[in-house]
Structure formats: structure tokens, C-alpha cells
């Protein structure tokens, strides 16, 4: 089982136990475990048993699906976890006599109930044959030797209401292991080549087992379901959760609704999802096959198999060790036993199988360890969750001297070869979704791949020899390629011989619900984004309804009404050009504008614009106008080079969209337009920013959402300096934003044959990953009502086929998105004192994001007008550009 830097050859933990009011549980058991140098848990091994009672018998009860409560003894697959098995459980339920396979000499044997499985003539009717019985004794072929076949409809025996689902989960299966192919893993390779597969599946952060297994089960991020690590402390409970502690059995730690509970609540039977480690893999497979043979009214519809390998070997030998071949062969052999067993039951064209991992594995050793004692003088005053990531809290909750910001400062950019980066949790990249939970410590260390972090050397080298007992680990940033894992779907409901783009594991819960005909519980996935995996779709997503329609300004205010402290119009030469520039701002119109709200038609100090209505070209809104999904008031402002949705509440655009061709030129800003800001005569002075606020607030400056550098003409450049294109920016952040607009946008347009860019502000002061309400915004430009964003976003869309220009694309789209933290310093980049070309693009890659993340943080909905199907658009929205090399 996954653990923080596990060492040595010891029995691993299989899975946590969690009992809920319905009679299904998920379970972890601990054999007596050797204390490991990198183990997060307490040094003493606690008893995991709420009660112990061995009276009674397992005769006729082996692996019963109903969990028996205390004080009776148990015979289910998790009784070992609770030390509550009946006294004869091992004798009756864990038989191993004569092994797990038929041989020629066993065919037609006299039934012996002591055998692990049977090769007798009656074994098929009794459902307890060895999985290779038909092959050895009846001359049939192994499943793996049969040709791929397209299963267009489920071929199930009578009585099966729906195709059963078997989830075959493997711990620590790095995606690149699949490159070993059929020579090492012929059965898994056949599942991949004949079914649906992705190059990899992205785990959630942290890339540890507990968080990811429970994410697979619930579709929730760790910050949402509460299992934020393999170990954690809850300050409200004043309790700690560890692999071997009794707390893991307490339901209060586990949030959300896992799949087996969803199934039970909707009348669908679920088999066990987790297994005690003492139960051999072969017995687990045989038990699942026996459950599939139960009468219709007893047979579950969903099952799960869990393997502790190849994680255990990956930790011990590293992902590249030659010793990894045998564990992978053993996993493949188990897959073959399952598929042969299904074929033997005539269920191989009926059952859907998902082969899935929880995370990958990286090459890590003790020699690559950063010690906080080299940075801090008080490491004995802190508690560090160590290893491939670091979580820091005060050792004593009463330590009044503990100051997270001081610790962050003492850990930031102190060495040129530093291998970790400290963050306050709210400043972590938004794509990690790792802040909004009290169990996540305030200080977080993102550790470089292949490295560890510890408090001091004594925490690692506890033995006099100082020998390192591990060669691999996981837990790193979930976009790192070595952390990616495997996904394969095979069966009648999955597509045949289909490769799909990578996706995140939060999406699988919805797919599994679709396979079982269930309505998913609320989760972080985007239902419908993986419809392309399935042959037929039971769920068809629909576009959300727009909540707030925009205003279309139909008048303009007189120049004399504005006293915003802006210094630009007096620089316009000749003077009569000012009125001409303002006339450029008239509403260009469209069918939407004709039927929309035109604000204000009467005012003694206002004059109507040219009344003609021109057909609006979609040059800058290639995929339709973003919809606002909450109640507010905003205006659509048209310009030659860009369009904006201007918020009357925030006094800045919610979004600004523009399209840049491959041939676009970057122009300089004339000296007389430096520090230029113009009033926008279409927007009331009361709904405009006041430039004087920036003169009063010495800590704040401003920038523009549409870059003046990319204006198409000298006249259009004046549009870019409108106050309605202005947003508050810290001077340090302006360096990032200016380089992005001046250099990177042009670079992306050149590389991709043109791009559409949508940018805007984000407000997430409570760091819950959702749009803040007005009441939740905490910071304003001094002396004003101008709110200060916590982040800025940018969505860059082009044609996937770069031979097609962005504005003429008739095929799939490509997207790169960013959520850039808006902070008063650039300390995240240790070389920020250098030229922006040395660090800004790397900073942006760190803060890459999904469009879906941006939608949650802004309350906007993008890509609403396109010829692509909505499911295809959802797939685009959930895509993350990782900037990693190929797996």
C-alpha cells in the first residue's frame, strides 16, 4: 500500500476500513508492520480491532457479503482487518491445497473440499472451478489467445439486469509500465488494445494512495472528501489519522458518497471493494467469480479487486529496477485468471472491466533529501509530514511564537540549488485543489521530483548504518509525468479499440455510475466529459442556463461629466480627434444586441449614438459570448480589436476576448501615451474606476486586459487605454502580465496559427475554488470601491490542427489555460530579479489550469456557440496542459 517513503521488505497495508450504516464497508488492514524511516505514523502499532470474538464458525459463510456486527464473529473479506474472524476462518476460507490451477492430472479429480479450487466434473455447476479448468480439461483457449472482438451489445446469461462492473485497481502503477507491452503483460495489453484506453490518467494531489483511492470512489478532490493524505491531523477533532491507527475506522474522517453507497441507496447490490492483505490474490479472484455465480436476487452488480503491487516493489527497487518485471508479470497473471474465469462462466462478453491505478512512481533515494534544519533553527518546534511533499504545523497548538509567514520567508529562495518551494496553502496552484480543508496545514512544501524533504538527518537515518532502504516514492505534483497512472476500460459498454485523451481521476465516478445506471451523488467531476469512452451514453449533458443577460449601452455620456483623474484625452492630437475616437465606441449591434437591454434612452446630459445597427462580426468571440451564471449587472463593450463583458459591480471586465492572427505584430507604446487612461463615454462615471485611487494607493498599480501592444492601428490603441479595459495590478505582477501580453501571446499565435484569448479577474479570498460573492471580497484599492483580484485567468484557444487558422477552424480545438496568482511579490520565482524571459513562462506553466477550474472561480460559462457537441466541449474544458514530456 502507498505510504510516505516506505522502506524495507515488510507486509504492506491493504486498505482503510470505514463502516457506514448500510452493510457495506471499505477496509484497510495492518499486519504487524515494521517501523519505516519515512513512515508518518506513530512508533507504536495500535490494535485495529474494535472487538475480538472468535466464537462461532465460518462453515458455509466464507466471504459472506453481509457484514455481521459485534459481538458475533465474522467471515467476510474484512474480518482480518477487525481481528474479528471466526476461529476457523483461515482453515475454511483460505484453503491453498493443490494450488490455484488445474493440471492434466487433476482433470476429473474426485472432489476434495480441502482444495483451494477444483478440477472435478461438477465444478462448473458448483461455481468453484480453478480459472483454467476449461483450458486444461476441456481444450478451450485462454482468453488472451483469442482475437479481439467487438462486443456491440452485452451478451449476458438470463437474469442479469445490467452488465456487472469489475474495478481492478493496482497500487503504484506508473503509466510508463504499459510500454513493457505484451512480452511482460499480455493480458493487460489485450485489454488495452481491444478496449478503450488513455495514454495516462492523472491522479489528484497529493499523489498518495489514500487520497486517490477515495477520489476514485467518490469523484471528489481530497480537500472535498477530507482524506488529504495518508496521515493527517484534524484540529477540531484533536485527533490524528494514520495507516495503523484506530482513527481510520471512524466514519467522521470520510466525506462524500462512495460508489458502493450510491449503488446501495439506489437498490443496486455492491460487492466488497477492498480486501485484507492476508487474502491471496487468487482467492480474491475466485471469490469475485463465485459472487458472479450467485442467484439473481443475491448477486452484486459491482465488484472491486485491489492489488498492493506494483507499489510495494516500486518503493523497494525503484520504477526502473529490473526487479519490477516480476511484479508486473504477477499482476498480469491475475488479470488473466480473472478473464479466463469470466470466459469460463460465459461472462467475458457481459462484464465491463476497468483496470486502473491510483498514482505512479518516481526514482527517489535518501541521498536526495532536503533537511529543514539547514534552513530553520527551530525544527524541533514544528511537525512536518515528510517525504515527497511537506506539510508543516506547530508541534504545540499553544506555541504563540509560531508564525507561518516567518517560516515561509526563511524557506523561500535561500539556496541556488534548493529542491522545494514553500507556499501558504492558499497560494498553491489552483489546479491542485489543495487548500480548502482544515486538515491541510497552512504551510505546504512542493518538492522537486526525485527528492524528499525531512526535518533533520536523524529523521531519515535512524539506524547506525545510515543505509537507505527505498528506491522509489510518489506524492509529487500531479502533473509530473512519473505520477501518471493507467486507465483501461474493456467490455460491451466501452468503445472498441479506442484511444482517448488523458483525463483526471475525479471523472471516473460519474462513468462508473453511468455503467451501473446510477444517478451520481454531487462530486467534483464534470458529468458527460468522458462520454467518448462509452459505446452508448445514458447521460447527455446540457449547457447551463444563463442567469444574467448583459446590457448593451445605447447612449454615451458627455465628456464633461467625467472627472476620473485620468490623463490621456488631453494628449489626443488634434483636439477634434477626441470626438472621433469616442464615436468608434458605438454599439456595433447584432441580433443579440437588438433583442438585448439597451440601457438609458433619456438624459439631458447624454446624446444618442448613431442609431444604425450593423451586423456584428464574431471575430473576437469565436465560440460565443461567455454566459454569467449568477445574478449581476454587466455591459457588452465592443471595440475593433476586442470585446468585453464589463461589470458594473466590480468596475472592471468579467472577461475580455480578442483574436490574434499568426501575422499580428507587436507595436510599441508612443511616449505620449505612457500612463494613458481614457474615460469610456458608454459607461456611467459612477460605474467607472477612478484613476486617482491608484495615485493614493502606493502599493497598487493597474494593467489592461487587452494588450495595447497588439492594437491593429494607432486609433485602435486608444481603445486599449480605456478605463473599462483597466484592472488593478500589483507592480510586481505587472511584470508577469506585461511579458505574457507582449511576448507570449504573440509566440502562441505564431506557433498555433492564431489564437483566441479570453482573460479576466478572479476573486477567491476564501480559497474554496469557487467565485467569491461581494461580501467575501476582502481587499480594495485604497480609498476606493475597486476590488483587488486574487488571481487573473487567461484561456488561449486555437485549432488542434495548426494548419488551420484559429478563426477558420472546423475541427477539434486546442486549449491552454492559466490561473495566475496576483501577489505583491514574485518570490515564487527565485530568479525573478532577472529578465522576464528567464522565469515568467515557467511560472505560468506551474499555474496551468483547466477551463473548468476557471469557470468555477468566475461563475462564467465558455464555448457556448460552436459546432462541436457539448460532450466534446466538456472534454476540452476538463483538459489540462501539463507541459510535461510524453509518458
Swiss-Prot record:
Residues 586-615 are annotated as: Disordered. The record marks 877 as: Essential for catalytic activity. N-glycosylation, but not furin-cleavage, plays a critical role on secretion and on lysoPLD activity. Residues 586-607 have a biased composition (Basic and acidic residues). Its cofactor is Zn(2+); Ca(2+). Changing residue 171 to N: Abolishes lysophospholipase D activity. A motif (Cell attachment site) lies at residues 126-128. Zn(2+) 1 binds at residues 171, 209, 358-359. GO terms for molecular function: alkylglycerophosphoethanolamine phosphodiesterase activity; calcium ion binding; lysophospholipase activity; nucleic acid binding; phosphodiesterase I activity; phospholipase D activity; polysaccharide binding; scavenger receptor activity. Abundantly expressed in cerebrum and cerebellum. Localized in secretory epithelial cells in the brain and the eye including choroid plexus epithelial cells, ciliary epithelial cells, iris pigment epithelial cells, and retinal pigment cells. The keyword Cytoplasm does not apply. Zn(2+) 2 binds at residues 311, 315, 474. Residues 1-27 form the signal peptide. Inhibited by vanadate. Inhibited by micromolar levels of bile salts, such as tauroursodeoxycholate. Not inhibited by taurodeoxycholate. Not inhibited by hydroxysterols, such as 7-hydroxycholesterol, testosterone, dexamethasone and prednisolone. Inhibited by EDTA and EGTA. It comes from the Eukaryota. 1-hexadecanoyl-sn-glycero-3-phosphate binds at residues 209, 230, 311, 474. GO terms for biological process: cell chemotaxis; cellular response to cadmium ion; cellular response to estradiol stimulus; estrous cycle; immune response; negative regulation of cell-matrix adhesion; phosphatidylcholine catabolic process; phospholipid catabolic process. 1-(9Z-octadecenoyl)-sn-glycero-3-phosphate binds at residues 209, 230, 311, 474. Residues 144-501 are annotated as: Phosphodiesterase. Glycans are attached at residues 53, 398, 410, 524, 610, 831. The nuclease-like domain is most probably catalytically inactive as residues that are essential for catalysis in the DNA/RNA non-specific endonucleases are not conserved. However, it is required for the stability of the protein and the catalytic activity born by the Phosphodiesterase domain. Belongs to the nucleotide pyrophosphatase/phosphodiesterase family. Secreted lysophospholipase D that hydrolyzes lysophospholipids to produce the signaling molecule lysophosphatidic acid (LPA) in extracellular fluids. Its major substrate is lysophosphatidylcholine. Can also act on sphingosylphosphorylcholine producing sphingosine-1-phosphate, a modulator of cell motility. Can hydrolyze, in vitro, bis-pNPP, to some extent pNP-TMP, and barely ATP. Involved in several motility-related processes such as angiogenesis and neurite outgrowth. Acts as an angiogenic factor by stimulating migration of smooth muscle cells and microtubule formation. This is Autotaxin.
